[in-house]
């Protein structure tokens, strides 16, 4: 289901002329970086889940290794937007990470109506311009010197 959500987002971003970059490793805090007009945005994508008839967006990562569970809450230092993908309705919730940081585990999608398919939030804004899409590697690694 996670891949379906990513594919849905990818289709919508490409229709809107975004460039999409994905990490080589799967276990990263960033699912993809998008670029348009020189503006880079880091995205985390989660599939909307239904529990007891209610749809919720999980806002943390739970991983386990050899019986040890780790819970990670995403921050604005790591990502710019959280994308909730409802694969039953093909709706995408475009949520700034500042909203996500206010919740511990999940958000009911009934409170997220403003963010439903609101792709305008991802469009480059005046004053929100980095040095360009060619600098994706530098943004990911912090390395301004290139590969050594």
Q: What annotation goes with each model-predicted range?
A:
Residues 1-23:
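Acidic-basic catalytic patches of nuclease active cores, encompassing PD-(D/E)XK
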Residues 27-31:
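Beta-rich nucleic-acid/ligand-interaction surfaces
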Residues 9, 13, 32-34, 39-49, ...:
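Conserved catalytic cores of phosphodiester-cleaving nucleases, focusing on short active-site segments
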Residues 9, 16, 39-43, 81, ...:
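Short alpha-helical elements
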Residues 14, 18, 41, 59-73, ...:
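Conserved functional hotspots at enzyme active or ligand-binding sites that engage polyanionic ligands
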């Amino acid at each position: 289901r996670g891949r379906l959500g990513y594919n849905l987002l990818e289709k919508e971003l490409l229709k809107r002329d975004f460039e999409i970059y994905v990490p080589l490793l799967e276990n990263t805090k960033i699912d993809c970086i998008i670029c348009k007009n020189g503006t880079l945005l880091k995205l985390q994508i989660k599939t909307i889940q239904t529990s007891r008839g209610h749809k919720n967006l999980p806002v943390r990562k739970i991983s386990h290794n050899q019986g040890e569970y780790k819970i990670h809450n995403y921050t604005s230092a790591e990502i710019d937007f959280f994308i909730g993908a409802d694969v039953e309705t093909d709706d995408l919730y475009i949520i700034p990470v500042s909203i996500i940081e206010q919740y511990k585990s999940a958000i009911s999608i009934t409170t997220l109506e403003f963010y439903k398919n609101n792709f305008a939030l991802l469009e480059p804004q005046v004053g929100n311009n980095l040095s360009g899409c060619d600098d994706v590697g530098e943004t990911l690694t912090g390395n301004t010197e290139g590969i050594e």
